[in-house]
Curated annotation (Swiss-Prot):
It comes from Pectobacterium carotovorum subsp. carotovorum (strain PC1). It is a single-pass membrane protein. One of its GO terms (cellular component) is plasma membrane. The chain crosses the membrane at residues 22-42. One of its GO terms (molecular function) is transmembrane transporter activity. It is found in: Cell inner membrane. This is p-hydroxybenzoic acid efflux pump subunit AaeA.
Amino acid sequence: MKAFFLTLFRQQAVLIKKMSRVAITLVIVLCAIVAIFRVWAFYTESPWTRDAKFTADVVAIAPDVSGLLSDVRVTDNQLVNKGDVLFVIDQPRYHQAVAQAEADVAYYQALVTEKRRESGRRARLGISAMSQENIDQSSNALETATHQLAKAQVVLSLAQLELERTVVRAPADGWVTNLHVQSGEFIERGNTAVALVKKDSFYLLAYMEETKLEGVRRGYRAEITPLGSEKIFYGTVDSVAAGVNNSSSSANNKGLANVDSNLEWVRLAQRVPVKIRLDRQMGDLYPAGTTATVVITGEQVNNDKKPSPLIRLLYRLREFG
């Protein structure tokens, strides 16, 4: 009897061991299926793109007057404040123009005074002392001198404005970049001398595939991972472009964004620009034009929650497509 129970116990132990192995295998397979499904959904179904660019408002600064650059007061990539002097253009010439215009105004002021006095005197004498034609000529001369004075005053105002425009100032806070002028060079009116990347104007342009736009709405939150970084930043969808250029048509794009396909012989989903506002400005960390990966997470996201190692790994894999 003892041997029977011992054999039965051993058989039950073997059965339990086999069942444990099967259960463990099933759990592992189930976990693998769940993980694969999450990776597949995260990688293919969620609205995301690795083709996103940090972008900023850029002001092309060009002088409103022509002349020699007498002083360049900034260096390339320097941070400047609104109103700071960037460069100065040949002021002596424009000082002379103002002086000449002031002299013309003074001359015509004296001429108007003289013509007004003469016209008044002839009007008081009347036709008893001279002909009506002489009286009319005096009145016309006064009117002509008055118009000449007004014209001279306008010329003076323009000369003063041009003198003021010889000092080119920063229109906003930002970084001076692509500076390609030096003191002593002659610069033409309207020719761009430097670009100013406006501070606190950075945003993200994410080029989303049209097949994923259904999950993109104004106000949705976005997770942003700069290329080569494990840091995640956050933003909000501001808008989706209302149209892009039709690359299949030869018609004029009429100002619409032109987004080229990667491979012309494969039917690819059209990419549409999506503008994303950043929660905080990062112009000092990621210059305009640098790349990031963007995931649209929906209406809410916990900014304080750190991503899991799996999520960080998936972000890294997305950088490689």
